[in-house]
């Protein structure tokens, strides 16, 4: 397997070709820092409104916080007015943003109803005006996140990609669905491939990347330079580590142990409590705990307990108790399985060493020893 080539956006060469997708209500500073530690080469923050009059609010200030974040620091802005988008880009660049990302990919109704997000793809003239206004407003690189089109009958991703490159956009992230498709159906990797073939700037493929195998498949099918992971990093930030390991070694990295998952979650919760303050941090942390527990035994019990917790100490205790019980239960099972495998190997060695006359007796002895060692049910 050929290792992915480094991606360059303006003056920045990324550590790898894996990006965390911007997600409102998810990719706050604690989650971005966590995903970077877990192997993401770049992480975009939650989308910011282009209305700079709202930047004094606590919500906006938190979204503009990049304390301790490694380069390049990416801010995504959303809006439908070219001048407001230019003002927002300038404001964020002055505040330390090193890359400005334009949101034309969000399919949410509350965004599209304001003629922003992926709704912009319906109006190519407005798209051009916004791209030109933002690129001309700042000296930092500008990137664009978009979809394959407005609906299956209007896939204009290639047209907008070529327009963006000509205007000066330095990288594109393409979600493999139209706005009308939301997150339904399969991602259109063939459309992303067509977009990739139409431009020379770096392309990040986005959509349904949920495993190392899928990551490799998407790179092969799209020819993209990089991958952008969004929803599948929720409760599983180590997916970047797993994908990176597979792309470079063609081997599957071991899944994190329950102890490691517990420790990652615990540190994440503490960071959320510190970042938002206890009351808000406890509320924000609930969905993350739910994601960490997703697909695990008795996850519903954890959700119920967490929803009842109203302070950080109780929330941490509930989450710890749940994962500690999993470690105790499944850790013991693994230990017994390992002991059983060791017993079988020992028995096989004894049998092989015995001569023909007594081999049967030795095998029988191993069976007796194994039965004595097996815990009572």
Where do the model's predicted regions map?
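Flavin-dependent oxidoreductase catalytic cores
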Residues: 1-377
């Amino acid at each position: 397997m050929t290792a992915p080539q480094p991606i360059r956006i303006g003056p920045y060469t990324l550590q790898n070709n894996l990006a965390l997708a911007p997600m409102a209500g998810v990719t706050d500073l604690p989650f971005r820092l966590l995903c970077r530690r877990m192997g993401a080469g770049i992480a975009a923050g939650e989308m910011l409104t282009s209305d700079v009059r709202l930047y004094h609010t606590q919500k906006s200030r938190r979204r503009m916080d990049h304390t301790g974040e490694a380069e390049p620091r990416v801010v995504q802005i959303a809006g439908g007015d070219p001048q407001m988008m230019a003002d927002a880009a300038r404001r964020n660049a002055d505040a330390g943003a090193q890359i400005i990302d334009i949101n034309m990919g969000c399919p949410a109704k509350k965004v599209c109803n304001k003629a922003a997000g992926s709704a912009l793809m319906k109006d190519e003239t407005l798209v051009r005006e916004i791209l030109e206004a933002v690129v001309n407003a700042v000296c930092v690189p500008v990137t664009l996140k978009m979809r394959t089109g407005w609906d299956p009958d209007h896939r204009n991703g290639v047209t907008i990609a070529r327009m963006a490159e000509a205007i000066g956009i330095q990288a594109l992230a393409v979600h493999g669905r139209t706005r009308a498709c939301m997150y339904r159906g399969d991602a259109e990797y063939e459309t992303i491939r067509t977009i990739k073939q139409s431009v020379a700037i770096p392309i990040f493929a986005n959509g349904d990347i949920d495993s190392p195998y899928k990551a490799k498949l998407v790179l092969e099918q799209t020819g993209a330079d990089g991958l952008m992971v969004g929803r599948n990093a929720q409760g599983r930030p180590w997916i970047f580590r797993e994908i990176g390991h597979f792309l470079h070694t063609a081997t599957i990295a071991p899944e994190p142990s329950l102890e490691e998952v517990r420790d990652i979650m615990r540190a994440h919760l503490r960071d959320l409590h510190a970042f938002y303050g206890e009351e808000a941090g406890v509320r924000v942390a609930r969905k993350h705990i739910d994601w960490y527990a997703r697909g695990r035994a008795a996850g519903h019990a954890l959700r119920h307990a967490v929803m009842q917790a109203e302070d950080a100490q109780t929330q941490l205790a509930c989450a710890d108790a749940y994962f500690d019980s999993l470690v105790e239960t499944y850790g013991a099972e693994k230990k017994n399985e390992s002991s059983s495998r060791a017993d079988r190997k020992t028995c096989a060695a004894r049998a092989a060493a015995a001569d023909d006359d007594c081999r049967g007796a030795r095998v029988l002895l191993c069976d007796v020893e194994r039965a004595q060692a097996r815990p009572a049910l």
